[in-house]
């Protein structure tokens, strides 16, 4: 029955040098599954709780409590379970925690076990993870959202928006898309260098130059796309992550928080108008978190304005949570959900969120966190769940490239069955 023989967690380090949780699950057949848990810098207030130790060690960011919860209470309850009982295992941990946001055991403890169990099960069957989770229909390679300029909380650049991304929507295949993305990334480096700007990279591998503002960042990206020999608005589109919750202050969108005196302060309606203006002026296909996570009226305004022609992605808004997504669907707010496994804390709940989104006609985007590891599970999950899009950083830093490289392997393994959706990944006009 492939029973779980042992569960062992340890403290390792993420791409920012902060502690995180890694879990090994061993079966009675000697098979092992391993998963490392990512961590975010800008986190939604409705996310599942990442348990940290506090105190002086690691500036309060240690995860020994979460590790002890895995090695103690969680292991005590799960030893003897079949690794193929994913739903039962996940539900057992949810019940064991007993809180609505996994604050007792920690979402980082629970997720590490959940993903390691799935990997052990796939290894038991000598099957790739994407095939084990997704079955025979798992054949869609995602269109990459490549974060090439970082702003907001991810860099020291004086720009409020957190991420400026490129999407090679008309590539012939995933490998072709990655070629296009890397060429644009390297051309962007040259464009920045020629302007005497910094080419140091931020948390997610994108550049963090001292640009003059949002439009300067967009114009610079257009120049890099053209310099690489591609057509913006046709072969390559732009995606934004505004992370608006990071500069939503006292009911207004206060750009001065990141942009200083030249930044504007906008109401919800003005913010919606500004996003619509940018979308009409530039080849923007996707905007994530253009409004604060609690500004449902603002979200409704921007959805009504541009939701028919721009993908509007809820990250902090939905936090991979079916209850919040359900409200969004009911009120026709946004049209896409960002999927972050550590926002909700189990594989079962992640799958439920993707299924709910797709059944309602919303798109889904599999996503990394700014604090990542060499773990490439989300690459397999993007294919397994046919999300059609993945957001996993720039074309630099091995913690980001690990996911892209895994997708190259999956595409090669799938062969002729591999499907790259191009612009059909978006359900907009």
From Swiss-Prot:
GO terms for molecular function: magnesium ion binding; phosphopyruvate hydratase activity. Catalyzes the reversible conversion of 2-phosphoglycerate (2-PG) into phosphoenolpyruvate (PEP). It is essential for the degradation of carbohydrates via glycolysis. One of its GO terms (biological process) is glycolytic process. It catalyses: (2R)-2-phosphoglycerate = phosphoenolpyruvate + H2O. This is Enolase. Its EC number is 4.2.1.11. Keywords: Cytoplasm, Glycolysis, Lyase, Magnesium, Metal-binding, Secreted. Mg(2+) binds at residues 241, 288, 315. Pathway: Carbohydrate degradation; glycolysis; pyruvate from D-glyceraldehyde 3-phosphate: step 4/5. The active site is at 204 (proton donor), 340 (proton acceptor). It comes from the Bacteria.
